[in-house]
């Protein structure tokens, strides 16, 4: 069973919280979003979410490490990213998407990690916060 994230409901609660702040006169001057680092959203060219966003605790990544290692060895992957192997890392989640729904990757224009997606919903700006991006085993620090 997939662990589906309910972004519409979660974002509605963020907006409700901001409205409550306004009602009581406590207007935040800044806001940060923090979630588990490896989960992501794929957006198409019109910024629509492709498929369901599935949380890292799902079992769909089982065996995806072996699929990734057909393209790059674990040793080389670690040398490039400096991130330890965890079966739930973004790289293995993306391989699971490639195997089950390759059309999502074909249509995707943007990958945003979950905190960056919430920032996008709040601001309309697509950004990729560096330390967040490194957690997924996709970024080379060099």
Where are these regions (language model features)?
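Glycine-rich phosphate-binding segment of PLP-dependent enzymes
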Residues: 44, 65-75, 126-127
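Residue-level signal for well-ordered alpha-helical scaffold segments within enzymatic catalytic domains
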Residues: 16, 20-23, 67, 96-100, ...
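Residue-level structural signal for beta-strand termini and adjacent loop
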Residues: 54-55, 132
């Amino acid at each position: 069973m997939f662990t589906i994230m309910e972004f519409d409901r979660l974002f509605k609660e963020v907006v409700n919280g901001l409205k409550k702040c306004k009602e009581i006169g406590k207007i935040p001057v800044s806001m940060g979003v923090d979630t588990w680092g490896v989960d992501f959203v794929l957006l198409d060219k019109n910024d629509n979410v492709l498929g369901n966003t599935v949380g890292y605790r799902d079992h769909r990544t089982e065996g995806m490490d072996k699929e990734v290692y057909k393209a790059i060895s674990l040793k080389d992957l670690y040398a490039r990213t400096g991130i330890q192997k965890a079966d739930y890392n973004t790289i293995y989640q993306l391989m699971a998407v490639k195997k089950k729904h390759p059309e999502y990757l074909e249509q995707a224009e943007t990958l945003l990690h979950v905190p960056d997606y919430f920032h996008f919903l709040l601001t309309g700006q697509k950004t990729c916060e560096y330390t967040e991006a490194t957690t997924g085993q996709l970024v080379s620090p060099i």
